[in-house]
C-alpha cells in the first residue's frame, strides 16, 4: 500500500495548491507548515472531500482521483473528531462498517478489536458525552482503523488537548500506528509533534511542498532557508563566498571567516549558511575544524533546567555592502557549577565547521 500525489492542482479564489509527494506502506508522513499553507486542502484532495483540477492521486496502485469519497476506503481523523453524539462509542466505531453492510456479528468483533487497540476495552456502550478529551481522541482513531483503511489521514488530531495529554497520546499513537501497514499523512503545525510521530516530514508553504526529508535530516541538514528557519534547530546567517578551497568554500559571515566543508547548493545572489545546534559549543574546544568567536550577551534568562541566551554579533559588511548587526539566540543546559553569562558581558563560542552547510 502507498499514496502517490502526482501533479495535483486545486484553486480556491486567489489561493492554489500544486502538490507532488508520496507516502510508503506503513510510513507516517507529517505534513507541516504555517496556517493557510494548504495542509488541510491536501487531506481533502486525498480523501475525496475535494476534487483535483489536474493531476492524479494513486493509492495502492489504483488511480482514485475520480472516485467519490465513500468508495476510496480512506479514513480521516478530523481536528474536531466529528463523533456522532447520538451514538454510543461502539456505534461510532461501527458506523462505517454499517454503511458497508458488514454483518452485525462481524461488526461487533471489529469494534471490540479496535477498542482493545486503543486501550478502551469495555467502552462500547459508553456515551460520547461521558468521555474525556483523550478518550474521545482514542475513539476517533479506533473508528478510523476499524475499516482497515487503504490510507489513514489525520488533521491536527491532538491540537485541542492540553500539553501533558498531547504528549501521552503522541506516544500511544506510535504504538497504535505500528499495528497498521496503511500509509499515513499526519497534518500538524507543531514541529515537536511532527518529529515524534513521523518517519518523514514534508514542509508545505503557499500550497507547494518546499522540502521533504527524514526527521533527522530536515532538522539537522535542511536544504532550504525556509526549512532551516521554520524548524529552528540551528542558526541561519548571511554570508559572502570568498573562494573555493580544497577543504571547501571559505565564506565571510557575521561569525567571522568560516569554511563550509559540506558540499551543497547555494544561492549565488544571496548565499546563506546554516549551523545546527550541535555545531555550537560553549566549552573551550581546541580541536581541528572548530572555530572560536566572541559576542556580546544582550539577554540571559535562567529557566531552571536551561538558560536562554541572546547574543549580538560584531558588525559585518554584507555582499550588498550593508553593515549588518545580527543577533542569535541559544538555549543551553543549565550547569549550577558554571557562571551564568550576564547581560552586557561577552562570551566565547566555538563552532564545528564540519557541520556548516549552505541553504538556498
Give the role of each language-model region.
Residues 32-34:
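The feature captures the beta-strand-to-loop junction immediately N-terminal to the Walker
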Residues 13, 234, 244-360:
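Non-catalytic connector elements of ABC transporters
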Residues 55-63:
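Conserved ABC transporter NBD signature motif
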Residues 47:
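Helix-to-loop junction immediately C-terminal to a conserved catalytic motif
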Residues 3-13, 17, 57, 298-300:
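Conserved beta1/A-loop at the N-terminus of ABC ATPase nucleotide-binding domains
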Residues 40-43, 139:
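ABC ATPase nucleotide-binding domain helices that frame the ATP-binding cleft
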Amino acid at each position: 500500500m502507498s499514496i502517490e500525489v502526482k501533479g495535483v492542482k486545486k484553486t480556491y479564489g486567489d489561493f492554489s495548491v500544486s502538490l507532488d509527494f508520496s507516502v510508503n506502506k506503513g510510513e507516517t508522513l507529517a505534513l507541516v507548515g504555517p496556517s493557510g499553507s494548504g495542509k488541510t486542502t491536501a487531506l481533502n484532495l486525498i480523501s475525496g472531500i475535494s476534487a483535483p483540477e489536474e493531476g492524479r492521486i494513486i493509492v495502492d496502485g489504483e488511480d482514485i482521483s475520480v472516485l467519490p469519497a465513500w468508495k476510496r476506503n480512506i479514513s480521516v481523523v478530523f481536528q474536531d473528531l466529528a463523533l456522532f453524539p447520538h451514538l454510543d462509542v461502539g456505534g461510532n466505531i461501527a458506523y462505517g462498517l454499517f454503511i458497508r453492510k458488514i454483518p452485525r456479528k462481524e461488526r461487533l468483533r471489529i469494534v471490540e478489536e479496535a477498542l482493545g487497540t486503543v486501550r478502551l476495552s469495555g467502552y462500547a456502550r459508553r456515551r460520547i458525552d461521558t468521555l474525556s478529551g483523550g478518550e474521545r481522541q482514542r475513539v476517533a482513531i479506533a473508528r478510523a482503523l476499524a475499516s482497515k483503511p487503504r490510507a489513514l489521514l489525520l488533521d491536527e488530531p491532538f491540537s485541542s488537548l492540553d500539553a501533558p495529554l498531547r504528549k501521552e497520546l503522541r506516544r500511544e499513537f506510535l504504538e497504535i500506528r505500528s499495528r497498521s501497514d496503511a500509509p499515513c499523512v499526519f497534518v500538524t503545525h507543531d514541529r515537536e509533534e511532527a518529529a515524534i510521530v513521523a518517519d518523514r516530514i514534508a514542509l508545505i508553504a503557499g500550497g507547494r511542498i518546499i522540502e521533504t526529508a527524514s526527521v533527522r535530516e530536515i532538522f539537522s541538514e535542511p536544504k532550504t532557508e525556509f526549512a532551516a528557519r521554520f524548524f529552528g534547530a540551528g542558526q541561519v546567517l548571511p554570508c559572502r563566498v570568498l573562494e573555493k578551497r580544497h577543504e571547501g568554500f571559505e565564506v565571510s559571515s557575521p561569525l567571522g571567516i568560516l569554511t563550509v566543508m559540506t558540499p551543497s547548493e547555494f544561492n549565488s545572489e544571496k548565499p546563506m549558511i546554516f549551523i545546527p545546534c550541535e555545531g555550537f559549543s560553549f566549552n573551550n574546544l581546541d580541536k581541528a575544524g572548530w572555530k572560536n568567536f566572541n559576542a556580546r550577551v544582550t539577554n540571559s534568562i535562567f529557566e531552571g533546567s536551561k538558560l536562554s541566551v541572546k547574543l549580538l554579533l560584531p558588525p559585518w559588511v554584507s555582499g550588498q555592502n550593508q553593515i549588518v548587526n545580527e543577533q542569535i539566540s541559544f538555549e543551553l543546559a543549565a550547569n549550577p557549577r558554571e557562571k551564568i553569562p550576564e547581560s552586557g558581558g561577552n562570551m566565547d563560542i566555538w563552532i564545528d565547521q564540519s557541520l556548516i552547510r549552505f541553504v538556498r
